[in-house]
From Swiss-Prot:
The record marks 163 as: Transition state stabilizer. This is Methylthioribose-1-phosphate isomerase. Pathway: Amino-acid biosynthesis; L-methionine biosynthesis via salvage pathway; L-methionine from S-methyl-5-thio-alpha-D-ribose 1-phosphate: step 1/6. The lineage of its organism: Bacteria, Pseudomonadati, Gemmatimonadota, Gemmatimonadia, Gemmatimonadales. Coiled coil: none annotated. It catalyses: 5-(methylsulfanyl)-alpha-D-ribose 1-phosphate = 5-(methylsulfanyl)-D-ribulose 1-phosphate.
Length: 344
């Protein structure tokens, strides 16, 4: 069936119309303002990723790929020798922007490998083509995740999700929200509960915004109410995205995901993870090996003077709590190998 249209006026991440810049929808300003930004300088691209102007593992990968290309083109003046000299440094600076999301490193690695195998005189064109391939693949992977995920989203489903893994987190219709968009397009009635997702409120600001724009019934709840909601039998399934999936099936996702998974298990509600193959990292053995990014204390609001903060951006949900993994290749089971990982 036709793919449902994006609930956004423009994709969250992609090329500018003239193909000379990285275009993003600045998510720091949502839902109050919709501001599109065109970026070409490496530092502003790194800053956009680091400050969550563009966020979501797949979207970060696309942003890094396009951003690396346009920054190299601008700063080299189109001179390949200069671009090759800048490549390693620019790639490393982008990879350091957010360490937990595997798609960022995956996309940069693809471009670096492309540069190394490309003949002299055609590197910049080859990098541009590879970045576009990464963007187009993400759109297709989102659609495939949505199609496969329809199997667990029946008519009348009541779904809980955490953070934002929708169109705002990808170049397409999302990962965790893709099956919901597909189900809605088929006329299935849905009730969605979106965790607020403190401290940056991605669920309240972003998930609720894009679902409501698509005409899907959505309610926001404080993070601390998720267990109560599950205990009252008001949820049929939980679907979340992922920033990195270890070889054994452990999943790093927005902090608070682990608590939702524990509550879902306690109340016998199936818990699914939706992610493209590019988010599976067979080189990371378990969740204990995943580097967890910590954010600044000022994200937590005003604190008493001298009181420190512990503010991890992600937590790790063990494989034992996960009913299934919905990927662009269908439902998969760990242990994961290179064959499960797109582009490795």
């Amino acid at each position: 069936m036709p793919v449902p249209p994006l609930p956004l006026h423009v994709p969250a991440v992609g090329w500018s119309p003239d193909l000379r810049a990285l275009r993003i929808l600045d998510q720091r300003l949502l839902p109050g303002a919709q501001e599109v930004r065109d970026l070409v300088q490496l530092e502003e691209i790194v800053e956009a990723i680091r400050t969550l102007a563009v966020r979501g593992a797949p979207a970060i990968g696309v942003a890094a790929a396009i951003g690396l290309v346009v920054a190299l083109e601008v700063d080299s003046g189109g001179q390949e020798t200069r671009a090759r000299a800048l490549l390693a440094d620019y790639a490393a600076r982008l990879q350091r922007a957010r360490p937990t999301a595997v798609n960022l490193g995956w996309a940069i690695d693809r471009l670096v490998r492309t540069a190394h195998r490309t003949a002299v005189g055609s590197m910049l064109a080859a990098l541009r083509a590879e970045a576009e391939a990464i963007r187009a693949e993400d759109v297709a992977m989102c659609e495939a995740i949505g199609q496969h995920g329809l199997a667990v989203v029946p008519d009348g489903a009541r779904v809980l999700t955490h953070c934002n893994a929708g169109a705002l987190a990808t170049a397409g219709i999302g990962t965790a929200l893709a099956p919901l968009y597909m189900a809605h397009a088929r006329g299935r009635a849905l009730t969605v509960y979106a965790d607020e997702t403190r401290p940056l409120r991605q669920g309240a600001r972003l998930t609720a915004w894009e679902l409501s724009r698509a005409g899907i019934s959505v309610s926001v709840l404080p993070d601390g109410a998720a267990a109560s909601l599950l205990s009252q039998g008001l949820v049929d399934l939980v679907i979340v995205g992922a920033d990195r999936i270890a070889a054994n099936g452990d999943v790093a996702n927005k902090v608070g995901t682990y608590g939702v998974a524990l509550a879902a298990a306690a109340h016998h509600v199936p818990f699914y993870v939706a992610a493209p193959g590019s988010t599976i990292d067979p080189h990371t053995a378990t969740g204990r090996d995943i580097v967890i990014e910590h954010r600044d204390a000022d994200e937590l609001g005003e604190l008493p003077p001298g009181v420190p903060a512990w503010n991890p951006a992600f937590d790790v949900t063990p494989r034992a709590l996960i009913r299934g993994y919905i990927t662009d290749r269908g439902f998969v089971e760990p242990p994961f190998t290179l064959a499960d990982y797109a582009g490795r």
